[in-house]
């Protein structure tokens, strides 16, 4: 499979999430199953059924995290320039129709989170921004139509270095 870019902090967050899953959530679920099993008849034991469903979910999440870590390619942001938008850069863009400015960090698909203004380089807006410079106009095709932006600033966040 193809390696996916990820920031150092994104990679560390995935590792912490995996560790929490292995050391806290899965052991707690094992105890829940044991307690529910002790209640007797498993065929009509809702507690047991719920704990087994959670076990399945947790093991699916475990596989997903292990796969994501294996496919991760940590990019050293210290080596990046801030004259063009590249993976890891934080950009400030201004929407032409409203004048509203928004900042986004371009990250890999494993760490994108719109509530943290982290968008994937594979998203429509991420693809449109890659390679642009300050002052460039950017057209983004969205389900709601074409949106026009101007690149106001590009920088590498010092906390990511």
Swiss-Prot record:
<dbReference type="GO" id="GO:0070063">
    <property type="term" value="F:RNA polymerase binding"/>
</dbReference>
<dbReference type="InterPro" id="IPR022691">
    <property type="entry name" value="Tscrpt_elong_fac_GreA/B_N"/>
</dbReference>
<dbReference type="GO" id="GO:0032784">
    <property type="term" value="P:regulation of DNA-templated transcription elongation"/>
</dbReference>
<dbReference type="InterPro" id="IPR036953">
    <property type="entry name" value="GreA/GreB_C_sf"/>
</dbReference>
<dbReference type="InterPro" id="IPR023459">
    <property type="entry name" value="Tscrpt_elong_fac_GreA/B_fam"/>
</dbReference>
<dbReference type="GO" id="GO:0006354">
    <property type="term" value="P:DNA-templated transcription elongation"/>
</dbReference>
<keyword id="KW-0804">Transcription</keyword>
<comment type="similarity">
    <text>Belongs to the GreA/GreB family.</text>
</comment>
<comment type="function">
    <text>Necessary for efficient RNA polymerase transcription elongation past template-encoded arresting sites. The arresting sites in DNA have the property of trapping a certain fraction of elongating RNA polymerases that pass through, resulting in locked ternary complexes. Cleavage of the nascent transcript by cleavage factors such as GreA or GreB allows the resumption of elongation from the new 3'terminus. GreA releases sequences of 2 to 3 nucleotides.</text>
</comment>
<feature type="coiled-coil region">
    <location>
        <begin position="46"/>
        <end position="71"/>
    </location>
</feature>
<dbReference type="Pfam" id="PF01272">
    <property type="entry name" value="GreA_GreB"/>
</dbReference>
<keyword id="KW-0805">Transcription regulation</keyword>
<keyword id="KW-0238">DNA-binding</keyword>
<dbReference type="GO" id="GO:0003677">
    <property type="term" value="F:DNA binding"/>
</dbReference>
<dbReference type="InterPro" id="IPR001437">
    <property type="entry name" value="Tscrpt_elong_fac_GreA/B_C"/>
</dbReference>
<dbReference type="InterPro" id="IPR036805">
    <property type="entry name" value="Tscrpt_elong_fac_GreA/B_N_sf"/>
</dbReference>
<protein>
    <recommendedName>
        <fullName>Transcription elongation factor GreA</fullName>
    </recommendedName>
</protein>
<dbReference type="Pfam" id="PF03449">
    <property type="entry name" value="GreA_GreB_N"/>
</dbReference>
<dbReference type="InterPro" id="IPR006359">
    <property type="entry name" value="Tscrpt_elong_fac_GreA"/>
</dbReference>
<dbReference type="InterPro" id="IPR028624">
    <property type="entry name" value="Tscrpt_elong_fac_GreA/B"/>
</dbReference>
<dbReference type="InterPro" id="IPR018151">
    <property type="entry name" value="TF_GreA/GreB_CS"/>
</dbReference>
<keyword id="KW-0175">Coiled coil</keyword>
């Amino acid at each position: 499979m193809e390696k996916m870019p990820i920031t150092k902090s994104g990679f560390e967050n995935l590792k912490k999430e995996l560790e929490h899953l292995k050391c806290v959530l899965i052991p707690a679920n094992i105890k829940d199953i044991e307690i529910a099993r002790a209640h007797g008849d498993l065929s009509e034991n809702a507690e047991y059924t719920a704990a087994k469903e959670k076990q399945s979910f947790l093991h699916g999440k475990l596989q997903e995290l292990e796969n994501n870590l294996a496919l991760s390619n940590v990019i050293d942001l210290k080596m990046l320039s801030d004259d063009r938008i590249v993976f890891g850069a934080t950009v400030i863009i201004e929407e032409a129709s409203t004048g509203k400015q928004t900042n986004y960090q371009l990250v890999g698909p494993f760490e994108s989170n719109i509530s943290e203004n982290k968008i994937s380089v594979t998203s429509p807006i991420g693809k449109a921004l890659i390679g642009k410079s300050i002052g460039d106009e950017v057209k983004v095709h969205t389900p709601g139509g074409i949106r026009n932006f101007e690149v106001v600033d590009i920088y590498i966040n010092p906390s990511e270095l």
